Curated annotation (Swiss-Prot):
Gene (name only): TSPAN13
Glycosylation sites noted in the Swiss-Prot or TrEMBL record: N113, N137
Source organism per UniProt: Bos taurus (Bovine)
Pfam families named in the record: Tetraspanin
Taxon lineage: Eukaryota, Metazoa, Chordata, Craniata, Vertebrata
Phosphoserine sites (modified residues): S143
Membrane topology: Multi-pass membrane protein
Cytoplasmic-side positions: 1-19, 66-72, 189-204
Name of the molecule in the record: Tetraspanin-13
Amino acid sequence: MVCGGFACSKNCLCALNLLYTLVSLLLIGIAAWGIGFGLISSLRVVGVVIAVGIFLFLIALVGLIGAVKHHQVLLFFYMIILLLVFIVQFSVSCACLALNQEQQAQLLEVGWNNTASARDDIQRNLNCCGFRSFNPNDTCLASCVKSSHPCSPCAPIIGRYAGEVLRFVGGIGLFFSFTEILGVWLTYRYRNQKDPRANPSAFL
């Protein structure tokens, strides 16, 4: 049977949703690993990562059940949700790739000022204090505070990695965006195909 047939569409859709399931479990595992090893103490960051992982897992589960059972309603809702996720993810990925250095610096400073626990993690892991300058009256968990050498501000250190991280995130986001639009197309095609094992008189 050629790959345009019912069985091939079903297998491709199942494989795609198994990939989404693995990615969702990986996200949840990374968040738990970061908390367990003390790399991340921000519950907000961990909560967002876990929420994204659970959301992706539920989408994959709906798609997998719909594909296995050829369930018209589940496949319809799966297709709509996947299309909405594609639009959001594609927009965010393009924004990550389009940010210039000045916009990156502004975004980093806003994030720095609004996430106290993540700020402590950054200062401890990168061994720096303050964003552009360090106020001795502020609390800093970096080891450089205990040394005789002055602590470096975190902005230049973060800035060196920000561009690479944004390009990486944008690239990964674009890759998954195209897998999502592929999933929408496969779902639409598979949903309108007739199951050869079904009753010929049944309405699809």
